[in-house]
Curated annotation (Swiss-Prot):
<keyword id="KW-0808">Transferase</keyword>
<keyword id="KW-0418">Kinase</keyword>
<dbReference type="InterPro" id="IPR006259">
    <property type="entry name" value="Adenyl_kin_sub"/>
</dbReference>
<dbReference type="GO" id="GO:0008270">
    <property type="term" value="F:zinc ion binding"/>
</dbReference>
<keyword id="KW-0067">ATP-binding</keyword>
<comment type="subunit">
    <text>Monomer.</text>
</comment>
<protein>
    <recommendedName>
        <fullName>Adenylate kinase</fullName>
        <ecNumber>2.7.4.3</ecNumber>
    </recommendedName>
</protein>
<feature type="region of interest" description="LID">
    <location>
        <begin position="124"/>
        <end position="163"/>
    </location>
</feature>
<feature type="binding site">
    <location>
        <position position="153"/>
    </location>
    <ligand>
        <name>Zn(2+)</name>
    </ligand>
</feature>
<feature type="binding site">
    <location>
        <position position="94"/>
    </location>
    <ligand>
        <name>AMP</name>
    </ligand>
</feature>
<comment type="pathway">
    <text>Purine metabolism; AMP biosynthesis via salvage pathway; AMP from ADP: step 1/1.</text>
</comment>
<feature type="binding site">
    <location>
        <position position="125"/>
    </location>
    <ligand>
        <name>ATP</name>
    </ligand>
</feature>
<feature type="binding site">
    <location>
        <begin position="134"/>
        <end position="135"/>
    </location>
    <ligand>
        <name>ATP</name>
    </ligand>
</feature>
<dbReference type="InterPro" id="IPR000850">
    <property type="entry name" value="Adenylat/UMP-CMP_kin"/>
</dbReference>
<dbReference type="InterPro" id="IPR007862">
    <property type="entry name" value="Adenylate_kinase_lid-dom"/>
</dbReference>
<dbReference type="InterPro" id="IPR027417">
    <property type="entry name" value="P-loop_NTPase"/>
</dbReference>
<feature type="binding site">
    <location>
        <begin position="11"/>
        <end position="16"/>
    </location>
    <ligand>
        <name>ATP</name>
    </ligand>
</feature>
Amino acid sequence: MIRLIFLGAPGTGKGTISSYLKEQHGFFHISSGDLFRFYAKEEKTALAEEIKSYINNGLYVPDELTNRTVADFYHKNQSQDKIIFDGYPRTLNQCEYIDEIIKFTHVILLQPTDWDMIINRLSLRRSCPQCKRIYNINSVDFKPKVANLCDLCKVELIHRKDDDPSVVSTRINVYNEQTKPVIEYYKKKNLLHVVDANKSFEELYKLVLEIVNK
């Protein structure tokens, strides 16, 4: 049984690698951002209404509610053999909470050596609003087959506002400051594996597979 956490700032490749692990190796993918959107849209529960009250008002979802949401979704899907957590945990409080529920097997930190490359990668990123598949319009391997259309859903791709270069630097700085304690937490538990996020996707994917298959 594999319980994997991906850590890394925006643009380091967490979502793309997670998608490939899901499609090619049967991993179940839990993304905190997607979870909030799912609960707010699909679920008809008190928990969903609570999440909706924050999202609809543009407010940050507090740790306590994030923890309950992830735990609720995990309990409904814990029979899955291989699960990826992407974007969670992001704070020390979240780490301590979820470690009482789940025994993680691997924590992979995608850490760039060149941040300018990451900022450029994000500025070229496009995503499908339906299936969440990620594309890069300047990459031979990751651009859509038909310009600006998702290969799977055939809907128009979007460029998220928070992927604009003017916003990306702030997102990266906030993420790095926020996750320093998380990185130290899993380092002390001897679960942390650090991978250079500036490597090509093929190299990154190969390294990740080597880690999870140990």
